[in-house]
């Protein structure tokens, strides 16, 4: 996809990694209706693209995303404004649901401030990394609307109930180090190293078996709301499904071969397990 002025995102493919980049730097990469629909369309295409093993979301310029594009809010009566936000919320939620559903791992590469719905979209990704100058702000209180973009779902699960309440009610800005401490991001990198480190992580994700990553995503998402009995039963079902996949047959054959037994992986396993 081109990144010209006709589009609000670009999509780049490198080494099995697809990067969805928000390309509205003059608008702080605010989420216009077009940006959200283009992102959703891109995710649908990438879901069925076998050449893609991982998906990165990032922003062009100095900002990840400023959330809702308030310049699109109509000047009409309250009912018209409510209809506008209802439609935009549906777009946002469709993107977030797709990020949760897609088997391929998603990585939020937060290159600058993540605000409001931009923060929400980053929370919906499987992993998140940021530059050391990134900041994180709920912002919903600032503009007079209730929190959305899945923040009610993901924040308590990621940072815990007390911190989620504190953050949303006080509306304070978190810097990169505090965001890391709270678990909002997995890693913080210097701005100079950011792109290369994002590439390393994304390529590592892309190299892993997609079907297994999808099973992991499903279990982590569903397991937190299940009983222990239900969770372990679903794990057994996933194990049975995975050992019936050709990938497992290949790995088992490799493990049984002399080449595998003499590899570094086998040595590490022997060391850990006390083998000879």
Curated annotation (Swiss-Prot):
Q: Which chain regions cross the lipid bilayer?
A: none
Signal sequence annotation: none
Q: How does it assemble?
A: Homotetramer.
What is the protein name for this chain? Answer: 4-chlorobenzoyl coenzyme A dehalogenase-1
**Which controlled-vocabulary keywords does the entry list?**
Hydrolase
Q: What is its EC class?
A: hydrolase
Which reactions does this protein catalyse? Answer: 4-chlorobenzoyl-CoA + H2O = 4-hydroxybenzoyl-CoA + chloride + H(+)
A Pfam family found in this protein is ECH_1
* Residues noted as binding substrate in the record, renumbered to the chain: 66-71, 117, 261
Q: Which family does it belong to?
A: Belongs to the enoyl-CoA hydratase/isomerase family.
Q: Which InterPro entries match?
A: ClpP/crotonase-like_dom_sf (IPR029045), ECH/Chromodomain_protein (IPR051053), Enoyl-CoA_hyd/isom_CS (IPR018376), Enoyl-CoA_hydra/iso (IPR001753), Enoyl-CoA_hydra_C (IPR014748)
Read off the PANTHER family from this record.
ENOYL-COA HYDRATASE_ISOMERASE FAMILY PROTEIN (AFU_ORTHOLOGUE AFUA_1G01890) (PTHR43684:SF4), PTHR43684
Q: Which SUPFAM superfamilies is this protein grouped with?
A: ClpP/crotonase (SSF52096)
Biological role stated in the UniProt entry: Dehalogenates 4-chlorobenzoyl-CoA, 4-iodobenzoyl-CoA, 4-bromobenzoyl-CoA and, at a slower rate, 4-fluorobenzoyl-CoA. Does not dehalogenate 2-chlorobenzoyl-CoA or 3-chlorobenzoyl-CoA.
This enzyme's EC code(s): 3.8.1.7
Q: In which pathway does it act?
A: Xenobiotic degradation; 4-chlorobenzoate degradation; 4-hydroxybenzoate from 4-chlorobenzoate: step 2/3
Catalytic residues as annotated in Swiss-Prot or TrEMBL: 93 (proton acceptor), 148 (nucleophile)
Name the source's superkingdom.
Bacteria
Q: How does activity depend on pH?
A: Optimum pH is 8.0 in MOPS buffer at 30 degrees Celsius, 7.5 in 0.1 M potassium phosphate buffer at 30 degrees Celsius, and 7.4 in 20 mM potassium phosphate/2 mM DTT buffer at 30 degrees Celsius. Retains full activity in MOPS buffer between pH 6.5 and 10.0. Is irreversibly damaged below pH 6.5 in MOPS buffer, enzyme treated at pH 6.0 in MOPS buffer only regains 40% of its original activity after re-equilibration at pH 7.2. When treated at pH 5.2 or 10.1 in 20 mM potassium phosphate/2 mM DTT buffer activity is lost completely, but is recovered within 17 minutes following readjustment to pH 7.4.
Q: What Gene Ontology molecular-function terms does this entry list?
A: 4-chlorobenzoyl-CoA dehalogenase activity
Q: How does activity depend on temperature?
A: Optimum temperature is 45 degrees Celsius. Activity is lost after 5 minutes incubation at 60 degrees Celsius, but one-fifth of this activity is restored after cooling to 45 degrees Celsius.
Provenance organism: Arthrobacter sp
Q: Does the keyword Hydrolase apply?
A: yes
């Amino acid at each position: 996809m081109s990144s010209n002025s006709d589009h609000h995102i670009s999509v780049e493919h490198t080494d099995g990694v697809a990067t969805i980049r928000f390309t509205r730097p003059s608008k702080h990469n605010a989420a216009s209706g077009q940006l959200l629909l283009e992102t959703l369309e891109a995710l649908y295409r990438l879901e069925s693209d076998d050449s893609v093993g991982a998906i990165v979301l990032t922003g062009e310029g100095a900002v990840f995303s400023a959330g809702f594009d308030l310049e699109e809010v109509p000047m009409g009566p309250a009912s018209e404004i409510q209809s506008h936000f209802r439609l935009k919320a549906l777009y946002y939620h469709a993107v977030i649901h797709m990020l949760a559903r897609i088997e391929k791992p998603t990585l939020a590469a937060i290159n600058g401030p993540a605000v409001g719905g931009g923060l929400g979209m980053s929370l919906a990704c499987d992993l998140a990394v940021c530059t050391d100058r990134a900041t994180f702000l709920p912002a919903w209180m600032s503009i007079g609307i209730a929190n959305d973009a899945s923040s009610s779902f993901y924040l308590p699960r990621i940072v815990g109930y007390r911190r989620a309440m504190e953050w949303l009610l006080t509306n304070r800005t978190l810097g990169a180090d505090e965001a890391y401490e709270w678990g909002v991001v997995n890693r913080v990198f210097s701005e100079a190293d950011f792109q290369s480190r994002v590439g390393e992580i994304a390529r590592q994700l892309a190299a892993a078996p997609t079907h297994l990553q999808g099973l992991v995503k499903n279990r982590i998402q569903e397991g937190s709301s299940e009983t222990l009995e239900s969770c372990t039963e679903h794990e057994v079902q996933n194990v049975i499904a995975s050992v019936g996949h050709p990938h497992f047959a290949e790995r088992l054959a490799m493990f049984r071969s002399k080449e595998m037994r003499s590899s570094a992986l086998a040595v590490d396993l022997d060391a850990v397990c006390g083998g000879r």
